[in-house]
Amino acid sequence: MATKIVIDAGHNGLSDPGAVYNGRRESDDTLRLAMAVGEILSRSGYDVDYTRTGNINQSVIQKAQLANDTDADLFISIHRNMSEVPGSYHGVQSLVYDLNGPKLTMAEAINKNLEGVGFRNINVEARPNLAVLRRTKMPAILVEVGFIDNAEDNKLFDTRLDEIAQAIADGIMDTLTSIENEASDGQPAAEKPVDRPLYRVQVGAFYNLQNAIDLEQELKRMGYNTWIVTA
């Protein structure tokens, strides 16, 4: 089995902890789950790499580049969601660059499996603006595994982590097996990488570092991937 899969634990645990609610950090949850998913895939014979196995200063651009440099066949990014009003939303959602190809089938399978664990299945949505989906050359999926500000989602995450990891891994493996079977029957299945233009948007420029940090944190709360650079 030659399939190489890169598993990304969302955010980095240092400069970017992701969503934080009542002391609970998204970056800690994503690392636990990413390692569990990767372990299942490795035991099943897949070649697995990780963007991180601990807390490191790493940007989303570096995550995507790591996957590209390893010539991965698939990129799975594990995240958790957060609502503007704590506790107002719950469920799982998967994000893809566009709603085409095997990645859509895989995202739908992952969502359905997680629904079987107990999460509400929100949907699969196209998010071409996300760097880890836009800059990766291989099919990529970002899975939002419940809301970090929802008590029921957190209870599922904490008490059924192994089942959640198995549900994600099964969605990946079942789809890959289906693709392999279709390919052996002479049916086109694989998604070809496409070159995508990269656009950058600058929101603000400041002489005061704290002002830049404040704006960056506000944008992250709105769901944007941001980083601070010096001119």
Where is each model-derived feature located?
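Active-site-proximal helix/loop segments of hydrolytic enzymes
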Residues: 2-4, 14-16, 24-191
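Solvent-exposed beta-strand motifs enriched in subsets of small alpha/beta binding domains
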Residues: 183-231
